[in-house]
């Protein structure tokens, strides 16, 4: 069993590495998406703020917590800002969250981990509840993928068909 445990640890490390590689790609996509959106609605320093927001989402939602408190006052108070611009910036963020949560992350992470769209979304909810919001959201996909792979390995090793 020592060999089996070592093999599963290697599998888990591989899952973590590939997860963070894909998460980096997602963050870059989000950065360009938010940056372009903020720039298009006329937010001062919009591309920079949006890009930083996307990249900081390596820890899920961290970029939003840090960047929205900067972006929203800028949209309202700087260079003829208005409630309209503030709502446009907020709209870009909401639309980006929708795209990320339902399409970008599930597609990129779900296809490679074997979890699928629903599995990715469920894993976020489950692990955020079990480990807390920050650690749970950060490790949700690698932990779920490892659980699936471990289950398959244990099933193949210990469960024999009856028929």
Features from the language model and the residues they span:
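Hydrophobic alpha-helical segments typical of transmembrane helices
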Residues: 4, 32, 103-108, 122
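Hydrophobic transmembrane alpha-helices
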Residues: 52-62, 69-77, 91-99, 126-130, ...
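Alpha-helical transmembrane segments and their immediate interhelical loop/hinge regions
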Residues: 1-74, 83-86
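Alpha-helical transmembrane segments
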Residues: 76-88, 93, 97-115, 156-163
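Membrane-embedded alpha-helical segments of multi-pass transporters/permeases
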Residues: 31, 35, 39, 76, ...
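Canonical bilayer-spanning transmembrane alpha-helix
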Residues: 37-56, 107-155
